[in-house]
């Protein structure tokens, strides 16, 4: 099919691409007409035979493509986005974590060395790799300033008296470390309850126990200390004290009971009027105080 002469094709930027699509289906002996034929009353089963003969992909089989500047830009942007997506998909992460810049060995080497002529690469083995990633056009003066700044920082750390100095070996759990714990061992132990040791009463061999064995311990009679007065134990007759004979007599012969006091019978008065014995008298003083009245009670 002729779309025009060569001048017109060059002005319209016609591009001729010869695409040779070879079907990759396993049904090579089946003709193409049966593969692409779609009936009106039945469903389309073309996707089951070959992926290349879909309606959308059939449009790509055109022999000529009309392209303009706008379409070229869109295709370039689309290709860049697809390449970026592919790059994101191809990102791979390392299984092992990156080692820290300040490892224990490098930090101990920094504290040990007192010289200030150590280079940045010797102290930080990974520093060179970080610097290479910045830019190749960086001037040497910037790196010299970085080295000077690092040297000043290390010098301040070494000259600072308040910085805690770490030991030579960072193996704090090594068996060479010795801790003095004698102060903790001298602490007096806690008061423990001690059981009172009771004397065991031994029974004579002639005694025979009958019945069940009793688990209750018999109450042991402890000898009590009794204090006696010296005069009672060893009296002395020189000082007028009691002798042992007097003590024995008092023990053997208890004191006699005191005799009851016998009162003499009182004289019973009799009444002068009746002659009967008087039981009680009541004397009443008069108002003037000059005289009195006596009332007697008689028996009988």
UniProtKB/Swiss-Prot annotation:
Alphabetically ordered keywords of this record: Meiosis, Nucleus
Conditions for induction: By X-rays and bleomycin treatment.
Superkingdom per UniProt: Eukaryota
GO biological process: DNA repair; female meiotic nuclear division; male meiotic nuclear division; pollen development; response to X-ray
One Gene Ontology cellular component: nucleus
Keyword Nucleus among UniProt keywords: yes
InterPro entries associated with the record: XRI1 (IPR039933)
Main location: nucleus
Disruption phenotype: Complete sterility.
Localization terms from the record: Nucleus
Extra remark beyond the main annotation: The induction by X-rays is dependent on DNA damage signaling by ATM.
Function, as annotated: Required for mitotic division of the generative cell nucleus and the development of mature tricellular pollen grains, and for male and female meiosis.
Self-association and partners: Interacts (via C-terminal domain) with MIP1.
Annotated PANTHER family: PROTEIN XRI1
Protein name as annotated: Protein XRI1
Organism from which the protein derives: Arabidopsis thaliana (Mouse-ear cress)
């Amino acid at each position: 099919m002729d779309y025009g002469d060569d001048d017109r094709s060059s002005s319209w930027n016609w591009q001729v691409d010869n695409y040779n699509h070879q079907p990759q289906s396993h049904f090579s002996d089946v003709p193409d007409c049966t593969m692409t034929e779609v009936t009106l009353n039945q469903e389309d089963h073309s996707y089951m035979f070959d992926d290349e003969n879909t309606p959308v992909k059939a449009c790509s089989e055109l022999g000529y493509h009309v392209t303009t500047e706008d379409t070229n830009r869109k295709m370039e942007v689309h290709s860049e986005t697809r390449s970026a997506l592919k790059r994101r998909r191809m990102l791979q992460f390392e299984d092992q974590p990156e080692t820290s810049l300040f490892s224990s060995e490098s930090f101990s080497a920094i504290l040990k060395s007192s010289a200030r002529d150590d280079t940045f690469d010797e102290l930080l083995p990974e520093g060179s790799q970080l610097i290479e990633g910045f830019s190749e056009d960086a001037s040497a003066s910037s790196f010299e300033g970085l080295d000077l700044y690092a040297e000043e920082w290390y010098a301040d750390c070494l000259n600072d008296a308040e910085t805690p100095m770490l030991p030579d070996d960072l193996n704090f759990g090594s068996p060479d470390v010795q801790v003095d714990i004698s102060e903790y061992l001298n602490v007096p132990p806690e008061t423990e309850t001690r059981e009172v040791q009771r004397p065991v009463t031994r029974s004579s061999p002639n005694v025979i126990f009958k019945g069940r064995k009793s688990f209750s311990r018999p109450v042991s009679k402890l000898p009590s200390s009794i204090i006696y007065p010296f005069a009672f134990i060893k009296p002395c007759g020189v000082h007028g004290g009691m002798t042992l004979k007097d003590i024995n007599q008092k023990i053997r012969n208890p004191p006699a009971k005191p005799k009851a006091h016998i009162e003499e019978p009182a004289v019973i008065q009799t009444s002068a009027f009746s002659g009967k014995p008087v039981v009680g008298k009541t004397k009443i003083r008069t108002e003037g105080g000059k005289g009195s009245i006596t009332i007697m009670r008689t028996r009988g």
